[in-house]
Amino acid sequence: MKTKNTFLVSTKSETSIGQITQIIGPVLDVSFPPGNLPNIYNSLIVKGQKDDRAFSVTCEVQQLLGNNTVRAVAMSATDGLTRGMKVINTGACLSVPVGKATLGRIFNVLGEPVDNLGPVDTDTTFPIHRPAPAFPQLDTNLSIFETGIKVVDLLAPYRRGGKIGLFGGAGVGKTVLIMELINNIAKAHGGVSVFGGVGERTREGNDLYMEMKESGVINEKNIAESKVALVYGQMNEPPGARMRVGLTALAMAEYFRDVNEQDVLLFIDNIFRFVQAGSEVSALLGRMPSAVGYQPTLSTEMGSLQERITSTKKGSITSIQAVYVPADDLTDPAPATTFAHLDATTVLSRGLAAKGIYPAVDPLDSTSTMLQPEIVGEQHYEIAQGVKQTLQRYKELQDIIAILGLDELSEEDRLTVARARKIERFLSQPFFVAEVFTGSPGKYVSLIETIRGFQMILSGDLDGLPEQSFYLVGNIDEVISS
């Protein structure tokens, strides 16, 4: 716990007071007495009265302008601020509440609860700006993070302490997949999750919260039994809040990893909005834009966030980041910079969702750097490749089937199609968090069971079984017994 205090120590023995000299939208210029300038990233607080109501605006120092003046970005609306108002330098960067008391609660970028459930029952705080773990602290072992979801564990496995990109349009099951992962990490790994809603719709944040309460991920009756903390900085917030809300969520996750020594899942929805907010702030600060109008510091900002997400010898943060691709252009600097950090991609397919195959993870488009024989083992690798080849061949044959029908195919191709259809159905799985809606109990399938099941399908042991018996089941024994 000593590290916490070293970050929070002020450079001055007492806080200094400055005053606002200029306000342009969410950007403030503040002058301080000589020798009392705040550091970059220090938190400033402006207090005032509006309509007989006291308000306070927190800002973060971004630039030193000279002449004892700093430029800061506000974390909330600047309505009611005027030139000449007093500004308090807190002497440290923004700190947010952390620990078990944050589970089941919703916070804003400042770490203030916004769910009307009263104050957070903790005195422990962590600063949102922290250095990435030093090299000796890192855990360099390559190990798979088992999710209990067949299609993910077999074909695009997650790395413990890795970063995964989640791609998918509206209505293909992103939210349900996220909730299932939160549920499974709690049950199988004794871990917790932090969800950072960065610049997305308020309605989506509300829907997610309601669905989490319904599915039991957030326990209303006993909040302490919840499995996730939520941090929201939605589309209507100023760019300063959207730029920093990801760091607030990350600080909460780092506490669970470094102090509680747990495995943590960190969800960021959406990483593109983090870049977008940084671009807005950069323009407001008067920096020269780079390619496609993005901020010149794009790689640095992305790197400082992503490098803190890693495995250490104490615990791990595995991050799943929804990636919005503007105009479906993968070469756009924002997604291109994100891809450089990803270990795996999980692509959700509308075609599979339309067929009723959930989770609608595309087995051919999803990738992982972990799928190598020296990491996952020869058997896992061979079966994953066999599954992909069978599905790829089925995809190639679909045009012929549509025109000529199945009967015109060779015996070998007909067998491939039959097995591919069984594989496709066996990649579906009932989820714990969907029990409320589907009525069928959820299934956690271990990696060993997953490999055994697909090995039996590929070897032809189950050619005599109808394909429908492979649909929405857990392990292969359920198929055989049905």
Swiss-Prot record:
EC number in record: 7.1.2.2
Catalysis performed (reactions): ATP + H2O + 4 H(+)(in) = ADP + phosphate + 5 H(+)(out)
Broad class of the protein's primary localization: plastid
Keywords from the UniProt entry: ATP synthesis, ATP-binding, CF(1), Chloroplast, Hydrogen ion transport, Ion transport, Membrane, Nucleotide-binding, Plastid, Thylakoid, Translocase, Transport
Entry keyword annotation includes Lyase: no
UniProt membrane topology term: Peripheral membrane protein
UniProt cross-references to CDD domains, sorted A to Z: ATP-synt_F1_beta_C, ATP-synt_F1_beta_N, F1-ATPase_beta_CD
SUPFAM superfamilies hit by this protein: C-terminal domain of alpha and beta subunits of F1 ATP synthase, N-terminal domain of alpha and beta subunits of F1 ATP synthase, P-loop containing nucleoside triphosphate hydrolases
Cellular compartment(s): Plastid, Chloroplast thylakoid membrane
Biological process annotations from GO: proton motive force-driven mitochondrial ATP synthesis
Keyword Thylakoid: yes
Residue sites binding ATP per the record: 168-175
A GO cellular component entry from the record: mitochondrion
InterPro entries in UniProt: AAA+_ATPase, ATP-synt_VA_C, ATP_synth_F1_bsu, ATPase_a/bsu_AS, ATPase_alpha/beta_chains, ATPase_F1/V1/A1_a/bsu_N, ATPase_F1/V1/A1_a/bsu_N_sf, ATPase_F1/V1/A1_a/bsu_nucl-bd
Function: Produces ATP from ADP in the presence of a proton gradient across the membrane. The catalytic sites are hosted primarily by the beta subunits.
Subunit structure: F-type ATPases have 2 components, CF(1) - the catalytic core - and CF(0) - the membrane proton channel. CF(1) has five subunits: alpha(3), beta(3), gamma(1), delta(1), epsilon(1). CF(0) has four main subunits: a(1), b(1), b'(1) and c(9-12).
Similarity comment: Belongs to the ATPase alpha/beta chains family.
Protein's recorded name: ATP synthase subunit beta, chloroplastic
Organism encoding this protein: Gnetum parvifolium
Lineage: Eukaryota, Viridiplantae, Streptophyta, Embryophyta, Tracheophyta
Gene expressing this chain: atpB
